[in-house]
């Protein structure tokens, strides 16, 4: 959907739509290089929650993206942040200043950051991959959580959505009684999935690839066509892309990474880190500090930290 007008569609009210102020319990996830102002605003105008991906943006680019999104929609939208980024606090202040409705996090933000956002009216929604993490962020004050199962694209875990989702819902109080809304992610792409998620006790669904393929996505049509031509057996979970389990399309590049040596993978990571540095305006010192923060916040090896440059 395009333009600033609301698209006529049935309203589905859940605890999550009441929390963020939308009409449709669908979340367009913050995908690096994909989720820009146009896609985010189009999702918001259709009644869902659109989320800007900020990890691949400089501070100034993020501010421009927020301003542009506000020009395209008057409806609530969000920004996805890396909780371990060096300037996470400054980016949160930017969101507060511009009246962004939702702060989405790929990793759990610190309790004091959650408190700062909430006291300024933002809804805090971390993504989690285990029931114990959902309980932890709920105790810290998170307003909702996104749960992504193993079917999801991008960074993913080993547990299927059909197993992970009910475990999280049960840990938070059970279907119809969760302490905070739970959004289901991983393998959802249409109304049937939404109905299934609601039946499990979720308050909505989060989708990435489905929104990547829309007309408002900035992804080139040639790339979209590759997605459309692939079948169920054409994705692979690889640790060779960036050192962490990552569901990607099986392409020539991925096959080369899978069959290549670890040394070549590390070399590619350094080269991609240099490209990422140029595209974001970050300095090597800032990249190194982010790497240290990532190491402290996770159990990744140093090889995985360096390899993470393959997919910012």
Model-predicted regions and their roles:
Residues 29-30, 52-53, 184-185, 207, ...:
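Thr-Gly-centered strand-to-loop micro-motif
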Residues 107, 149, 184-186, 209:
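Short, structured patches in soluble enzyme cores that scaffold and shape functional sites
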Residues 127, 186-187:
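Conserved acidic functional residues
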Residues 34, 187-189:
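Residue-level detector of alpha-helix initiation sites
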Residues 7, 158-181, 189-312:
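Conserved active-site-proximal phosphate/metal-binding subdomains
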Residues 1-179:
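Active-site entrance/lid segments in N-terminal catalytic domains of soluble metabolic enzymes
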């Amino acid at each position: 959907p395009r333009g600033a007008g609301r698209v006529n569609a049935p309203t589905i009210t859940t605890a999550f739509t009441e929390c963020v102020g939308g009409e449709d319990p669908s979340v367009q996830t913050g995908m690096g290089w994909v989720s820009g102002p146009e896609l985010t605003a189009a999702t918001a105008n259709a009644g869902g929650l659109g989320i800007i991906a900020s990890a691949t943006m400089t501070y100034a680019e993020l501010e421009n993206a927020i301003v542009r999104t506000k020009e395209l929609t008057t409806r609530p939208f969000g920004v996805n942040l890396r909780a371990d980024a060096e300037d996470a606090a400054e980016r949160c202040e930017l969101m507060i200043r511009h009246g962004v409705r939702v702060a989405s996090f790929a990793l759990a933000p610190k309790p004091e950051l959650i408190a700062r956002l909430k006291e300024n009216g933002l809804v805090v929604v971390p993504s989690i991959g285990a029931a114990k993490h959902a309980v932890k962020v709920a105790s810290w004050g998170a307003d909702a959580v996104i749960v992504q199962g193993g079917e999801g694209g991008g960074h993913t875990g080993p547990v299927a959505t059909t197993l992970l989702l009910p475990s999280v819902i049960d840990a938070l109080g059970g279907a119809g009684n969760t302490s905070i809304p739970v959004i289901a992610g991983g393998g959802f792409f249409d109304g049937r999935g939404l109905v299934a998620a609601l039946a499990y006790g979720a308050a909505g669904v989060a989708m990435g690839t489905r929104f990547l393929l829309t007309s408002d996505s900035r992804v080139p049509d040639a790339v979209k066509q590759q997605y459309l031509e692939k079948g169920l057996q054409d994705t692979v979970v690889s640790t060779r892309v960036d050192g962490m389990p990552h569901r990607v399309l099986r392409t020539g590049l991925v096959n080369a990474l899978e069959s290549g040596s670890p040394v070549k993978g590390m070399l590619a990571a350094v080269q991609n880190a240099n490209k990422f540095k140029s595209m974001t305006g970050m300095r090597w010192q800032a990249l190194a500090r982010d790497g240290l923060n990532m190491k402290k916040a996770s159990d990744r090896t140093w090889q995985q930290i360096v390899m993470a440059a393959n997919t910012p």
